[in-house]
Amino acid sequence: MGRKLYYVLATLQLVAVFLFCGGFFPQKVVLKNDSKFIVNPEVQLASKPVFKKLVLVVIDALRSDFLFQKDSSDFEFLHGLLNSGEAWGYTAYSNPPTVTLPRLKGITTGSAPNFLDAILNVAEDDTSSNLKEQDSLLKQFHTHHYKMNFFGDDTWLKLFPLEFFSEYDGTNSFFVSDFEEVDFNVTRHVPYQMEHQKNWDVLILHYLGLDHIGHKGGSKSHFMPSKHREMDSVIKQIYEKIDGDTLMVVLGDHGMNDLGNHGGSSSGETSAALAFLSKRLKKYQSSDIQQSSNVPVEDAHPDYKYLKEVEQIDIVPTLSMLFNLPIPKNSMGVIIDELLQLLPSKLAAIKVQDNYLQLTKLKPGYEAQLEKKSAGTLLEEMREIQSSLAMAATNYNYTFLTYGTTLMIIGTLIVTVWNFQLSQEYIEHVGTSVLLGISMFASSFIEEEHQIWWWITISVLLLMQISNGKKLVVLSGLRLIRGWNNSGQKYIYDNVLHTLLKSHTSVLWWLNVVTFLSVGFPFLRNKDESEKMVSLLSVSFLALSSITYKICFAIVNGDKVPSGLYTFALRSCAMYLANENATESDISQCLVPIARIFFQICGVSIIILLFMKYALNKSTNMLNKLLSVIKFVLLLQTSSANIPLFLIFEILTSVTPDITPIFSLCLQNLTFFQFGGTNSIATVNLTNAYNGVSSNYNIYVVGVLMFLSNYAPSIYWALSLIPQSYKQKTLRLQHYYITGTCLMIACIALRYHLFIWSVFSPKLCYYAAWSLYNVVMDFAITLLGVL
């Protein structure tokens, strides 16, 4: 295939993918204008709200067990309120995608999330999700002259006009390395707000630290208990200052999985905590389940369902009822029935009827009937309507879907005909592509795609023309890779190598040191003394700076490191800070500078290598040295427990230096999954996306670092094909054309499937990411091949 046709087809694939995504993830159509009271508006307008003030405390990623289960919760003060009846607790189901932006939309508008919001969630300067023109709980508060103050996650300030707030102070939501200052910047406002309660009617606090701890160390991080106690003390500080006319609501916007990530649809991610706090509640009856329970609950539930379960969007009509506001027009929520007790019976009946008529307007053709229906009957009917609305919350753009799919089919036919040949390599490529394409029609195969890649990789290895001894070595290496991490979304195994090494830190860290040194070996192969000296200095600085950073990073995150490496890191930081008495608490100050020094050394090393080749005509092992610099970057962007996998990679490449394109394709995909990646947004790793980034968030820098950290193993194996012929490139392009075509057809055919948003949509996003990855790697391989 000619070069021009290759680039035309590569461009056509990207255009087709983004056209299809544009049709599959359109902006949701919403009802315009603000809502008004529907049933007996004169009675409702004349009624007084149950509460005069609201304190809304959002603790990001507060999973239900963090509040209600004994082994996972340290909210001692809140537990006391739950047991005394002054607090009513619920497990609030948060619809996927379980990331902050769509969940905040859900708890303020009551509407179902748009999957596109999960992507926009990482765009710091995005304004397309603004709710200025959409009816919401905050807009109703503003319209009815409630004074609102806000402190916390600045996502709120992107969603709502600043004129909604009398006072506000936003904190950055994506600098996940920080889980102390980000919460202190919220709590420091609390004393003043409590002393000047006349200055506000609604106080919103959004804490991010717990979520950041989850991203860094998982749901069982040893930082969790202290963070729980910190949040509990904030709740106590506020609750003891407010009176009976103030309602306090504590909730999580979503939960998290055991790895501390979120975005998917697992029980841990969708089960958020919710609690209503007021001294008045003691006079009424909480849910039957709460009355028969003692909080914290002894037994741990694998589905994270504690106390009574409600929909998270039910908060919207419930708060609207308690503050006598019209329910936002697009709300799909249903009033939480226990809280109806706080209203006079006649007014409570009116509020339920109002909720019923408002909800039925969202379902075209539904005949609303109020006559002779009790409040209980209406609530039950509303929950059925709510369920059906959630299933049909998206309007697809079929024109874009058709164009995107048609372009993919045309591209697939062209690249298949052009590449056609009766060779083993071609048959292996087509067989792999067809097998993966068929799997796109089954949600379980998408969730467990790593199983398919494992089977294909082993099959391709057995067909390779290498000695049995080499096959045995490669097979052993692949088995170690296979058993290193938990992969997929369905099963979690306790005895994986990743977990075992974490409990044997000395073995882990000395393997890490050996891995860093092995990556630098190409620098030691030189022809003359001057080249040898420059190479030795380069590899020394690269290895020392990267190892030092990873050790410091581990110490700051509370991970154990061998005493010798601990002392080395402490002395390194003492030298940098010019402070001989530096302690462990000072190490965090060195993280950003050390990472930046490392990246600067990488840049200088590349410049020196290019200078020596083109100016001094000294280019011994030039390509491998450039690849070594890239590998050092990949190691820095990899979690400490996964770094030894690169040592296995180095062994495999030395055993099979001439890797075939199909085997490289298999390894790119297999290692992506075996590093812990999946087809769920929940496993997008942000931990290393901030290496060298200060609190001045830069989405482009973070985006590149996030790309490197999530695709590090795949990048390694893609770079194994230098130089790469256009025949090899087109075979890879053919694979992604075939699988992409099947995925698009599957998404259209299964657009009303139960798992369309939790399985197929994330897979489509990952496919788009893989398409971009291929373009980037193609450019990088071409550039390195020229050098």
From Swiss-Prot:
User: What are the protein's UniProt keywords?
Assistant: Endoplasmic reticulum, Glycoprotein, GPI-anchor biosynthesis, Membrane, Transferase, Transmembrane, Transmembrane helix
Protein's name in the database: GPI ethanolamine phosphate transferase 2
Q: Does the keyword Transmembrane apply?
A: yes
Purpose: Ethanolamine phosphate transferase involved in glycosylphosphatidylinositol-anchor biosynthesis. Transfers ethanolamine phosphate to the GPI second mannose.
Its BP terms in the Gene Ontology are: GPI anchor biosynthetic process
Membrane spanning stretches: 400-420, 426-446, 455-475, 504-524, 536-556, 591-611, 629-651, 671-693, 699-719, 740-760, 767-787
MF-aspect GO terms: CP2 mannose-ethanolamine phosphotransferase activity
Instruction: Write the Enzyme Commission number(s) for this entry.
Output: 2.-.-.-
The record, for InterPro entries, names:
Alkaline_phosphatase_core_sf (IPR017850), Phosphodiest/P_Trfase (IPR002591), PIG-G_N (IPR037674), PIGG/GPI7 (IPR039527), PIGG/GPI7_C (IPR045687)
The subcellular localization recorded is: Endoplasmic reticulum membrane
Which family is this sequence assigned to?
Belongs to the PIGG/PIGN/PIGO family. PIGG subfamily.
An annotated GO cellular component: endoplasmic reticulum membrane
The UniProt entry lists membrane topology as:
Multi-pass membrane protein
Q: Does the keyword ATP-binding apply?
A: no
Glycosylated residues are 33, 185, 397, 485, 581, 617, 669
Its taxonomic path starts at: Eukaryota, Fungi, Dikarya, Ascomycota, Saccharomycotina
Record gene name: LAS21
**What pathway does the UniProt record associate with this protein?**
Glycolipid biosynthesis; glycosylphosphatidylinositol-anchor biosynthesis
